[in-house]
Design a protein with these regions (language model features):
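Non-transmembrane, aqueous-exposed alpha-helical and coiled segments at domain scale
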Residues: 112-127
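Beta-strand elements within well-structured catalytic alpha/beta cores of enzymes
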Residues: 1-2, 92, 125-135
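Short, solvent-exposed loop/turn segments at secondary-structure junctions
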Residues: 138-139
Length: 241
């Protein structure tokens, strides 16, 4: 979620993939954050883009746009903000601020395609899939300041053990349980959809300081190696398109 920093409601896409070699910090009102830029991976970005379109996701693509805390904050858990950040990044901006919002099922299916894209990329890479989006919160209207820590705990548990229950929920249900802005947790289903059914919970922590409940969740994918025949077939599928 870009928080209307570089992507505005006059042209607001459901899914926007970055295809660039660098992503700098945006000015979110107090000047750009003094953090290192994220280094892009052009080859993997292009491959993911081809896979998404081949699987009939109507994507937008961007270059030269600054990224905000929704993208940069998780990187601070991986290294020193003065940089350079470890590894390279492929940002995906999801339009969760203006209706119609893509469904939870759509997020999940995009994650499944993301997995196939990563598995079929010719270079042997170690890839971590990161999702962001605040847990329960609402910043406007009669429920401004709303938190629901019980729902947040249930959401995190379902994400680990029974994600299909979350896939079947409507956006309105997410908003009712977690606040309008808290509905952005559907973006976590992209990450979970990119993993196998068999995951190990490595770390889980929540903290509700004021306006937003914040969680850190780390899974290890215990799924086996991909079937090479299926990988080759998927490469042909992408190439055919």
């Amino acid at each position: 979620n870009d928080h209307v920093t570089s992507f505005f409601f006059d042209h607001y896409s459901a899914f926007v993939l970055g295809i660039d070699d660098q992503y700098v910090a945006a000015d979110e009102g107090g000047g750009p954050r003094q953090v290192a830029p994220g280094r892009g991976h052009l080859g993997l970005s292009q491959h993911i883009a081809m896979a998404m379109v081949a699987d009939e996701f109507d994507m937008s693509f961007f270059q030269g746009k600054a990224v905000d805390h929704g993208f940069l904050s998780p990187l601070s858990m991986l290294g020193d903000e003065t940089g350079p950040w470890p590894g390279r990044v492929v940002p995906l901006q999801v339009g969760v601020l203006q209706f119609p919002i893509p469904s939870a099922k759509r997020m999940w299916n995009l994650g499944r395609t993301l997995r196939k894209a990563i598995e079929s990329y010719p270079e042997d890479l170690n890839v971590a899939v990161m999702a962001t989006g605040g847990l329960s919160h609402q910043v406007h209207g009669e429920r401004a300041g709303f938190l629901n820590e019980a729902w947040d705990a249930e959401f995190l548990d379902l994400l680990e053990k029974a994600p299909q229950e979350l896939v079947n929920m409507r956006i309105a249900e997410y908003a009712a349980k977690g606040g309008m802005e808290g509905a952005e947790v559907v973006m976590w289903l992209i990450m979970r959809g990119a993993l196998s059914d068999n995951v190990r919970l490595v770390h889980k922590q929540t903290y509700a300081p004021s306006v937003t409940n914040i969680a850190t969740l780390v899974f290890e994918d215990l799924g086996g190696e991909p079937d090479q025949a299926a990988v080759e077939a998927y490469r042909r599928h992408i190439g055919h398109e």
